[in-house]
Amino acid sequence: MVIADLRLEYSSNVGFASDQGGRGFQHPSHMAMRSDKRIFVASRGVGPTVGIQMVSRDFEFFGKIGSQGTSVGQMMEPSAIAFDSDENMYVADEKLDRVTRFDYEGQVIDAWGVSGKGLGELRRPTGLLIIDDVVYVSDALNHRIQRYYTDGRFIDQFNSTKTIESQLRYPWGITSGLDRDLYVADWGNDRIVRFDLNGNLMSVLSKGLGAELPLNRPADVAVDPDGNIYVADWGNQVLQIFDQNDKFLYMSRGEADLNQWALEYFEAQQDEKQARSSYVPVYETDTEDVREVSARIEPYFWDPCSVMVDADSRVYVLETCRHRFQIFERI
Protein backbone atom coordinates (compact mmCIF):
# COMPACT_ATOMS: atom_id res chain seq x y z
CA MET A 1 0.00 0.00 0.00
CA VAL A 2 1.56 3.28 -1.10
CA ILE A 3 0.67 6.93 -0.70
CA ALA A 4 2.77 9.84 -2.05
CA ASP A 5 6.26 9.01 -3.30
CA LEU A 6 7.66 6.74 -0.59
CA ARG A 7 7.93 3.07 -1.50
CA LEU A 8 10.06 0.19 -0.26
CA GLU A 9 11.32 -2.75 -2.28
CA TYR A 10 12.26 -5.99 -0.53
CA SER A 11 15.96 -6.79 -0.85
CA SER A 12 16.88 -9.75 1.36
CA ASN A 13 16.82 -11.07 4.90
CA VAL A 14 19.45 -12.26 7.35
CA GLY A 15 18.89 -14.76 10.12
CA PHE A 16 18.53 -18.37 11.13
CA ALA A 17 16.98 -20.10 14.14
CA SER A 18 20.10 -20.94 16.13
CA ASP A 19 19.22 -23.35 18.94
CA GLN A 20 22.79 -24.28 19.90
CA GLY A 21 24.57 -20.96 19.43
CA GLY A 22 26.80 -20.00 16.54
CA ARG A 23 25.56 -18.31 13.40
CA GLY A 24 21.99 -17.11 13.76
CA PHE A 25 19.60 -15.69 16.36
CA GLN A 26 17.13 -17.01 18.90
CA HIS A 27 14.14 -14.80 19.71
CA PRO A 28 15.98 -11.55 18.95
CA SER A 29 14.69 -8.37 20.59
CA HIS A 30 16.66 -5.43 19.16
CA MET A 31 19.35 -4.48 16.65
CA ALA A 32 21.71 -1.57 16.09
CA MET A 33 24.32 -0.67 13.48
CA ARG A 34 27.82 0.61 14.26
CA SER A 35 29.59 3.17 12.06
CA ASP A 36 31.45 0.36 10.23
CA LYS A 37 28.01 -1.03 9.23
CA ARG A 38 28.40 -4.08 11.43
CA ILE A 39 24.97 -5.07 12.76
CA PHE A 40 24.52 -6.09 16.39
CA VAL A 41 21.49 -8.22 17.27
CA ALA A 42 20.31 -8.95 20.82
CA SER A 43 19.55 -12.68 20.95
CA ARG A 44 17.68 -13.89 24.01
CA GLY A 45 16.81 -17.55 23.74
CA VAL A 46 18.43 -19.93 26.24
CA GLY A 47 21.93 -21.09 27.05
CA PRO A 48 24.45 -20.55 24.23
CA THR A 49 22.02 -18.45 22.17
CA VAL A 50 21.95 -15.54 24.67
CA GLY A 51 24.15 -12.58 23.76
CA ILE A 52 24.82 -9.99 21.09
CA GLN A 53 25.32 -11.55 17.66
CA MET A 54 27.44 -9.62 15.14
CA VAL A 55 26.58 -9.89 11.46
CA SER A 56 26.50 -7.93 8.21
CA ARG A 57 23.71 -7.50 5.71
CA ASP A 58 25.83 -9.64 3.36
CA PHE A 59 25.52 -12.71 5.64
CA GLU A 60 28.91 -12.42 7.32
CA PHE A 61 28.96 -13.69 10.90
CA PHE A 62 31.52 -12.13 13.23
CA GLY A 63 30.75 -13.95 16.47
CA LYS A 64 28.98 -13.15 19.71
CA ILE A 65 29.49 -10.82 22.66
CA GLY A 66 28.37 -11.94 26.10
CA SER A 67 26.88 -15.13 27.50
CA GLN A 68 23.96 -16.18 29.66
CA GLY A 69 24.37 -15.36 33.34
CA THR A 70 24.19 -12.66 35.98
CA SER A 71 27.86 -11.69 36.34
CA VAL A 72 29.10 -8.39 34.93
CA GLY A 73 29.35 -8.82 31.17
CA GLN A 74 26.74 -11.56 31.07
CA MET A 75 23.08 -11.24 30.08
CA MET A 76 19.72 -12.85 30.69
CA GLU A 77 17.26 -10.92 28.52
CA PRO A 78 19.11 -8.32 26.43
CA SER A 79 16.51 -5.83 25.25
CA ALA A 80 18.25 -2.84 23.63
CA ILE A 81 21.60 -1.77 22.13
CA ALA A 82 23.16 1.67 21.62
CA PHE A 83 26.61 3.16 20.88
CA ASP A 84 28.27 6.25 22.35
CA SER A 85 30.63 8.69 20.60
CA ASP A 86 33.62 6.42 21.32
CA GLU A 87 31.70 3.46 19.85
CA ASN A 88 31.40 1.73 23.17
CA MET A 89 28.33 -0.49 23.15
CA TYR A 90 25.60 -0.34 25.78
CA VAL A 91 23.22 -3.25 26.32
CA ALA A 92 20.05 -3.02 28.41
CA ASP A 93 18.88 -6.19 30.14
CA GLU A 94 15.23 -6.21 31.18
CA LYS A 95 15.64 -9.30 33.37
CA LEU A 96 18.60 -7.94 35.34
CA ASP A 97 17.42 -4.28 35.32
CA ARG A 98 20.83 -3.02 34.30
CA VAL A 99 22.88 -1.55 31.49
CA THR A 100 26.26 -3.05 30.58
CA ARG A 101 28.97 -1.14 28.72
CA PHE A 102 31.42 -2.87 26.35
CA ASP A 103 34.36 -1.39 24.46
CA TYR A 104 34.84 -1.49 20.68
CA GLU A 105 36.36 -4.97 20.87
CA GLY A 106 33.49 -6.33 22.95
CA GLN A 107 35.30 -6.38 26.29
CA VAL A 108 33.16 -5.43 29.25
CA ILE A 109 33.89 -2.04 30.85
CA ASP A 110 31.27 -1.82 33.58
CA ALA A 111 27.59 -2.28 34.38
CA TRP A 112 25.09 -0.19 36.25
CA GLY A 113 21.46 -0.33 37.33
CA VAL A 114 19.42 -1.11 40.43
CA SER A 115 15.96 -2.69 40.43
CA GLY A 116 13.20 -0.55 41.86
CA LYS A 117 10.74 2.30 41.45
CA GLY A 118 12.85 5.15 42.84
CA LEU A 119 14.72 7.81 40.91
CA GLY A 120 17.46 6.20 38.86
CA GLU A 121 16.17 2.69 39.54
CA LEU A 122 14.94 0.44 36.74
CA ARG A 123 12.14 -2.01 36.09
CA ARG A 124 12.37 -3.67 32.69
CA PRO A 125 14.57 -1.29 30.66
CA THR A 126 13.45 -1.80 27.06
CA GLY A 127 14.99 1.01 25.00
CA LEU A 128 18.34 2.82 24.79
CA LEU A 129 19.45 6.01 23.06
CA ILE A 130 22.69 7.98 23.49
CA ILE A 131 22.92 11.66 22.50
CA ASP A 132 25.90 13.85 23.49
CA ASP A 133 27.00 11.02 25.79
CA VAL A 134 23.77 11.16 27.75
CA VAL A 135 22.03 7.78 27.98
CA TYR A 136 18.24 7.76 27.63
CA VAL A 137 16.57 4.60 28.95
CA SER A 138 12.97 3.51 28.38
CA ASP A 139 12.07 2.28 31.87
CA ALA A 140 9.02 0.26 30.86
CA LEU A 141 7.41 -0.87 34.11
CA ASN A 142 8.02 2.52 35.70
CA HIS A 143 6.39 4.19 32.66
CA ARG A 144 9.11 6.79 32.17
CA ILE A 145 12.29 7.80 30.38
CA GLN A 146 15.38 8.18 32.59
CA ARG A 147 18.63 9.96 31.76
CA TYR A 148 22.12 8.96 32.92
CA TYR A 149 25.72 9.82 32.27
CA THR A 150 27.58 7.05 30.48
CA ASP A 151 29.04 5.77 33.76
CA GLY A 152 25.54 5.27 35.16
CA ARG A 153 25.21 8.39 37.29
CA PHE A 154 21.57 9.43 37.33
CA ILE A 155 20.61 12.80 35.81
CA ASP A 156 16.81 13.01 35.80
CA GLN A 157 13.62 11.45 34.46
CA PHE A 158 10.40 12.39 32.72
CA ASN A 159 7.10 10.61 32.59
CA SER A 160 3.54 11.53 33.54
CA THR A 161 4.18 14.46 35.84
CA LYS A 162 3.48 17.20 33.30
CA THR A 163 0.27 16.60 31.33
CA ILE A 164 -2.07 13.70 30.73
CA GLU A 165 -1.16 13.83 27.05
CA SER A 166 2.51 13.19 27.79
CA GLN A 167 1.95 10.21 30.09
CA LEU A 168 3.82 7.13 28.99
CA ARG A 169 2.59 3.58 29.42
CA TYR A 170 5.17 0.85 28.95
CA PRO A 171 7.54 2.82 26.69
CA TRP A 172 9.63 0.55 24.49
CA GLY A 173 11.89 1.64 21.61
CA ILE A 174 13.41 5.13 21.55
CA THR A 175 15.29 7.03 18.84
CA SER A 176 16.07 10.54 17.62
CA GLY A 177 15.89 12.34 14.29
CA LEU A 178 17.95 15.05 12.63
CA ASP A 179 15.82 17.48 14.63
CA ARG A 180 17.44 15.95 17.75
CA ASP A 181 14.03 15.31 19.24
CA LEU A 182 13.22 12.04 20.97
CA TYR A 183 10.72 9.62 19.46
CA VAL A 184 9.33 7.03 21.87
CA ALA A 185 7.30 3.95 20.97
CA ASP A 186 4.64 4.30 23.66
CA TRP A 187 3.64 0.64 23.58
CA GLY A 188 0.79 0.73 26.07
CA ASN A 189 -0.83 3.82 24.57
CA ASP A 190 -0.58 2.68 20.92
CA ARG A 191 1.27 5.76 19.70
CA ILE A 192 4.59 7.46 19.03
CA VAL A 193 5.39 10.38 21.34
CA ARG A 194 7.90 13.09 20.42
CA PHE A 195 9.80 15.00 23.13
CA ASP A 196 12.66 17.45 23.12
CA LEU A 197 15.88 16.39 24.83
CA ASN A 198 14.63 17.71 28.18
CA GLY A 199 11.41 15.74 28.09
CA ASN A 200 9.06 18.50 26.96
CA LEU A 201 6.20 17.16 24.85
CA MET A 202 6.44 18.20 21.19
CA SER A 203 3.79 16.08 19.46
CA VAL A 204 1.84 12.83 19.56
CA LEU A 205 1.68 10.65 16.47
CA SER A 206 -0.77 7.83 16.75
CA LYS A 207 -3.03 7.38 13.78
CA GLY A 208 -0.94 5.13 11.57
CA LEU A 209 -3.30 4.09 8.79
CA GLY A 210 -6.12 5.73 10.72
CA ALA A 211 -9.40 3.95 11.37
CA GLU A 212 -8.41 1.16 8.98
CA LEU A 213 -5.29 0.17 10.90
CA PRO A 214 -4.39 2.37 13.90
CA LEU A 215 -1.12 1.63 15.66
CA ASN A 216 -1.38 -1.37 17.97
CA ARG A 217 1.38 -1.91 20.52
CA PRO A 218 4.26 -0.25 18.64
CA ALA A 219 7.55 -1.84 19.68
CA ASP A 220 10.15 0.40 18.05
CA VAL A 221 10.56 3.54 15.98
CA ALA A 222 13.14 4.94 13.55
CA VAL A 223 13.38 8.27 11.73
CA ASP A 224 14.99 8.80 8.31
CA PRO A 225 16.83 11.97 7.15
CA ASP A 226 13.60 13.28 5.60
CA GLY A 227 11.82 13.07 8.93
CA ASN A 228 9.64 10.11 7.97
CA ILE A 229 8.81 7.85 10.89
CA TYR A 230 9.08 4.06 10.68
CA VAL A 231 7.19 1.99 13.25
CA ALA A 232 7.58 -1.69 14.08
CA ASP A 233 3.86 -2.15 14.70
CA TRP A 234 4.01 -5.28 16.82
CA GLY A 235 0.28 -5.64 17.45
CA ASN A 236 -0.62 -5.38 13.76
CA GLN A 237 2.40 -7.43 12.61
CA VAL A 238 3.41 -4.77 10.08
CA LEU A 239 5.85 -1.96 9.35
CA GLN A 240 4.05 1.37 9.12
CA ILE A 241 5.57 4.61 7.84
CA PHE A 242 4.16 8.10 8.22
CA ASP A 243 5.38 11.67 8.16
CA GLN A 244 5.80 14.07 11.07
CA ASN A 245 2.28 15.36 10.53
CA ASP A 246 0.86 11.88 11.20
CA LYS A 247 0.06 11.33 7.53
CA PHE A 248 0.23 7.68 6.55
CA LEU A 249 2.74 6.88 3.78
CA TYR A 250 3.36 3.15 3.49
CA MET A 251 2.77 -0.26 5.06
CA SER A 252 4.43 -3.67 4.63
CA ARG A 253 3.58 -7.12 6.00
CA GLY A 254 6.99 -8.49 4.99
CA GLU A 255 8.20 -10.35 1.91
CA ALA A 256 11.02 -12.65 3.04
CA ASP A 257 12.33 -15.58 1.05
CA LEU A 258 14.91 -18.22 1.95
CA ASN A 259 18.17 -16.46 2.70
CA GLN A 260 21.73 -17.65 2.12
CA TRP A 261 22.08 -19.23 5.56
CA ALA A 262 18.85 -21.18 5.13
CA LEU A 263 19.87 -22.39 1.66
CA GLU A 264 23.24 -23.58 3.01
CA TYR A 265 21.41 -25.47 5.75
CA PHE A 266 19.18 -27.25 3.26
CA GLU A 267 22.19 -28.19 1.12
CA ALA A 268 23.51 -30.05 4.17
CA GLN A 269 20.10 -31.57 4.94
CA GLN A 270 19.00 -33.13 1.66
CA ASP A 271 15.98 -34.92 3.13
CA GLU A 272 14.58 -31.65 4.40
CA LYS A 273 15.43 -29.91 1.14
CA GLN A 274 13.58 -32.55 -0.88
CA ALA A 275 10.57 -32.47 1.42
CA ARG A 276 10.39 -28.71 1.24
CA SER A 277 10.76 -28.57 -2.54
CA SER A 278 7.81 -30.94 -2.99
CA TYR A 279 5.60 -29.19 -0.45
CA VAL A 280 2.98 -26.78 -1.72
CA PRO A 281 1.81 -24.65 1.22
CA VAL A 282 -1.89 -23.97 1.58
CA TYR A 283 -2.52 -20.91 3.71
CA GLU A 284 -5.80 -21.20 5.55
CA THR A 285 -7.29 -17.82 6.32
CA ASP A 286 -9.91 -19.02 8.78
CA THR A 287 -8.77 -16.55 11.41
CA GLU A 288 -8.72 -12.79 11.84
CA ASP A 289 -5.90 -12.97 14.38
CA VAL A 290 -3.08 -11.16 12.54
CA ARG A 291 -0.43 -12.81 14.69
CA GLU A 292 -1.77 -16.25 13.81
CA VAL A 293 -1.79 -15.30 10.12
CA SER A 294 1.85 -14.19 10.41
CA ALA A 295 2.74 -17.49 12.07
CA ARG A 296 1.31 -19.39 9.09
CA ILE A 297 2.78 -17.35 6.24
CA GLU A 298 6.58 -17.50 6.17
CA PRO A 299 7.31 -14.31 4.17
CA TYR A 300 5.33 -12.18 6.64
CA PHE A 301 6.71 -10.40 9.69
CA TRP A 302 6.11 -12.45 12.82
CA ASP A 303 6.38 -10.17 15.84
CA PRO A 304 8.33 -7.23 14.37
CA CYS A 305 10.20 -5.83 17.35
CA SER A 306 12.90 -3.49 16.04
CA VAL A 307 13.37 -1.18 13.06
CA MET A 308 16.29 0.93 11.84
CA VAL A 309 17.25 3.00 8.80
CA ASP A 310 20.88 3.12 7.67
CA ALA A 311 22.81 5.95 6.00
CA ASP A 312 21.83 4.63 2.57
CA SER A 313 18.11 4.69 3.47
CA ARG A 314 17.89 0.91 3.71
CA VAL A 315 15.24 -0.19 6.17
CA TYR A 316 15.77 -3.16 8.50
CA VAL A 317 12.95 -4.89 10.38
CA LEU A 318 13.79 -7.49 13.04
CA GLU A 319 11.34 -10.30 13.84
CA THR A 320 11.37 -12.11 17.17
CA CYS A 321 9.59 -15.30 16.16
CA ARG A 322 11.27 -15.85 12.79
CA HIS A 323 14.74 -15.11 14.10
CA ARG A 324 15.68 -12.82 11.21
CA PHE A 325 15.65 -9.26 9.94
CA GLN A 326 14.26 -8.23 6.56
CA ILE A 327 15.98 -5.54 4.49
CA PHE A 328 14.23 -3.10 2.18
CA GLU A 329 15.51 -0.49 -0.26
CA ARG A 330 13.74 2.83 -0.59
CA ILE A 331 12.73 3.46 -4.21
What annotation goes with each model-predicted range?
Residues 1-331:
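Eukaryotic scaffold repeat domains enriched in small/polar residues
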